[in-house]
């Protein structure tokens, strides 16, 4: 466990393309922690189907019962367990989570990924993960739920922004460029 561990939080609306940054980071030797996995695991422990509604309710319930930074607190030990000295955290949702990560990791930086609602809906619709929306109404409800926990604030406060409206290869190249800038700044 090194106090010098670089931790990069990735924030973005569902379907924005956070996984592009995560995959680029993985190829660059980062350990990976996915915050949504913690919520999906909790839903499974409660015996709930991993639908968008159930996963969303579990996310809100965890924050209500354990505080706004509940999921970040649950992920911190997983970050420390990673053998890599640089770790990407996929799915930061609020400034409370950002502050929680900063308490544990002095080298914590945020990368936001942005894409239009139409692009995001299409990506989620065709990805077909169990908690992805099946129609526009469910997509819109999920967006509002995510924004209600402070996702927009976390996006606004990110140090780096990747706009993901182009081809996948362009987004991958942008992600690598951003991660190199982060490393240049934080891993001297």
Regions picked out by a protein language model, each given a short descriptive name:
Residues 21-22:
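Post-Walker A alpha-helix
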Residues 31, 109, 159-160:
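Well-ordered beta-strand positions
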Residues 31-88, 92-99, 103:
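ATP-dependent small-molecule kinase phosphotransfer cores
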Residues 52-57, 99-153:
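A glycine- and Lys/Arg-enriched "phosphate-lid" helix/loop adjacent to the NTP-binding pocket
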Residues 69-70, 126-181:
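Small-molecule kinase domains that catalyze NTP-dependent phosphoryl transfer to phosphate-bearing small molecules
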């Amino acid at each position: 466990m090194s106090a010098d561990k670089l931790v990069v939080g990735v924030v973005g609306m569902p379907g924005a393309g956070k996984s592009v940054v995560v995959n680029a980071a993985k190829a660059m030797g980062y350990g990976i922690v996915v915050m949504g996995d913690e919520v999906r695991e909790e839903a499974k422990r409660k015996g709930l189907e991993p639908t968008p509604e159930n996963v969303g309710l579990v996310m809100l319930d965890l924050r209500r019962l354990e505080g706004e930074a509940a999921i970040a607190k649950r992920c911190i030990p997983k970050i420390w367990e990673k053998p890599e000295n640089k770790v990407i955290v996929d799915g930061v949702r609020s400034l409370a989570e950002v502050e929680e990560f900063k308490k544990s990791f002095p080298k914590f930086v945020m990368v936001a990924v942005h894409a239009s609602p139409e692009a995001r809906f299409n990506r989620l619709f065709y990805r077909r993960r169990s908690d992805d929306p099946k129609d526009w109404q469910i997509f819109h409800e999920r967006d509002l739920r995510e924004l209600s926990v402070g996702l927009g604030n976390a996006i606004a406060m990110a140090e780096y922004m990747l706009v993901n409206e182009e081809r996948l290869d362009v987004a991958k190249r942008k992600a690598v460029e951003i991660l190199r800038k982060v490393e240049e700044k934080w891993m001297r």
